[in-house]
Amino acid sequence: MKSLLLTILLLGLVAVLKAQEAPPDDLVDYSGIWYAKAMVHNGTLPSHKIPSIVFPVRIIALEEGDLETTVVFWNNGHCREFKFVMKKTEEPGKYTAFHNTKVIHVEKTSVNEHYIFYCEGRHNGTSSFGMGKLMGRDSGENPEAMEEFKNFIKRMNLRLENMFVPEIGDKCVESD
């Protein structure tokens, strides 16, 4: 009887300890508002397409681990809102979008609430495209996260001169 009770208590303790463990990487909740603190491209982005100002990105977690992403940008004197779904793959931190033409890798940094989002694929079916963003849950500068982003750039064989730090706007407002 004592051994049965001890077994039940032990199983209960294991269940409690398992519940307290951090979730695996593929269960990270990316929902919320994100700010692009720095960006890099693989050299295929023309200078006139480099944004001087960026706005917060909204991510909503969907069923099956997919992410609905809303990006707001300034284009030809107007605010444009663009929504797309990042489809979760079997590989943790890897998503596809735009009918599998783009692959997005999400990499955690050692800095709390900072991730690197790197999108690669074909642009208009022709040239290879790659862009990375250091994203944080707040808009403040973080030198440690920036240093990790620079190391990411080197690791990906990208050029530091293709890195830029855009101004972060609170929200896109059209002027009259």
UniProtKB/Swiss-Prot annotation:
Keywords: Disulfide bond, Glycoprotein, Secreted, Signal, Transport
Region forming the signal peptide: 1-19
Family: Belongs to the calycin superfamily. Lipocalin family.
SUPFAM superfamilies linked: Lipocalins
A Pfam family per the record: Lipocalin
The species this protein was found in: Mus musculus (Mouse)
Gene name for this UniProt entry: Obp2a
Claim: DNA-binding is one of the keywords in the record: no
InterPro entries: Calycin (IPR012674), Lipocalin (IPR002345), Lipocln_cytosolic_FA-bd_dom (IPR000566), von_Ebner_gland (IPR002450)
Alphabetical list of CDD domains matching this protein: lipocalin_1_3_4_13-like
Keyword Ribosomal protein: no
Subcellular location: Secreted
Other information: May be involved in the development of hepatic steatosis during obesity.
Residues carrying a glycan: N42, N124
The protein, known as: Odorant-binding protein 2a
